[in-house]
UniProtKB/Swiss-Prot annotation:
It comes from the Bacteria. One of its GO terms (biological process) is DNA-templated transcription. One of its GO terms (cellular component) is DNA-directed RNA polymerase complex. It is an enzyme of class 2 (transferase). It catalyses: RNA(n) + a ribonucleoside 5'-triphosphate = RNA(n+1) + diphosphate. Keywords: DNA-directed RNA polymerase, Nucleotidyltransferase, Transcription, Transferase. Pfam families: RNA_pol_Rpb6 (PF01192). The RNAP catalytic core consists of 2 alpha, 1 beta, 1 beta' and 1 omega subunit. When a sigma factor is associated with the core the holoenzyme is formed, which can initiate transcription. It comes from Shewanella denitrificans (strain OS217 / ATCC BAA-1090 / DSM 15013). This is DNA-directed RNA polymerase subunit omega. One of its GO terms (molecular function) is DNA binding. The keyword Phosphoprotein does not apply.
Length: 92
């Protein structure tokens, strides 16, 4: 496993504190929410994958915010469809 330095990731985000927040959010997406990594996993942990994605400019706070907004919209649409189906007496 190659050693990951955070300097390139810090340069992409702007400061190390924001970089930590972005990396943690992305790692959580990969580990807990089951989001697919945008880079080869190479048997790395989600935190290392998140840092590599940041270094390559694939992930930043804006992209994470947009992804989370889309996830909420999708979840709400599914809930509305389920409620409509129940109200009409059919099942999904």
């Amino acid at each position: 496993m190659a050693r990951v330095t955070v300097e390139d990731a810090v340069d992409q985000i702007g400061n190390r504190f924001d970089m930590i927040l972005v990396a943690a959010r992305r790692a959580r997406q990969i580990a807990v929410q089951g989001k697919d990594p945008m880079v080869d996993e190479m048997n790395d942990k989600p935190t290392v994958i998140a840092l590599r994605e940041i270094e390559l400019g694939l992930v930043n706070a804006t992209t994470l915010d947009a992804d989370e907004r889309q996830t909420v919209r999708d979840r709400e649409a599914a809930e509305v469809a389920a409620v409509s189906a129940i109200a009409e007496g059919r099942t999904l």
